[in-house]
Amino acid sequence: MTINTEVFIRRNKLRRHFESEFRQINNEIREASKAAGVSSFHLKYSQHLLDRAIQREIDETYVFELFHKIKDHVLEVNEFLSMPPRPDIDEDFIDGVEYRPGRLEITDGNLWLGFTVCKPNEKFKDPSLQCRMAIINSRRLPGKASKAVIKTQ
């Protein structure tokens, strides 16, 4: 199997752009969280997100615009993160406990970003959310899958 060099080059350029943009986004989130008096969190992206952005020809500038709006929703994200995680397969559910949905989606009504919570890591103080998908669909509705949705302005 051969790798298309244009895709390889585009992916590496996009990865570098994501790295620099995410430093700025995470700084904005840290400052907004401090100003709101809530715990900060850290955003990451997956390689899968880069591949889908290239494959679906999603404009990264548009994606970054939505990522930058997350700083205005630190309270909602913190509320999501403060919920107890769903029990592992071998653990029992506790009656009456509302568990954190498996996925958080942030949307402007057209672009949908899907996040999952990363497993806690002792090296990092703040919890992390990893963006794994980006979909453009203005008619998309929240599905039956376990998720929470934050709508930006």
Curated annotation (Swiss-Prot):
Essential to the early nucleolytic processing of a number of T4 messenger RNAs. Specifically cleaves after the GG dinucleotide GGAG within consensus 5'-GGAGRAYARAA-3' (R is a purine and Y is a pyrimidine) sequences found mainly in translation initiation sites. GO terms for molecular function: nuclease activity. Coiled coil: none annotated. InterPro entries: T4_endoribonuclease_RegB. Pfam families: REGB_T4. The lineage of its organism: Viruses, Duplodnaviria, Heunggongvirae, Uroviricota, Caudoviricetes. It is an enzyme of class 3 (hydrolase). Keywords: Hydrolase, Nuclease. Activity is stimulated 10- to 100-fold by host ribosomal protein S1, which also helps confer substrate choice. This is Endoribonuclease RegB. Its EC number is 3.1.-.-. The gene is regB.
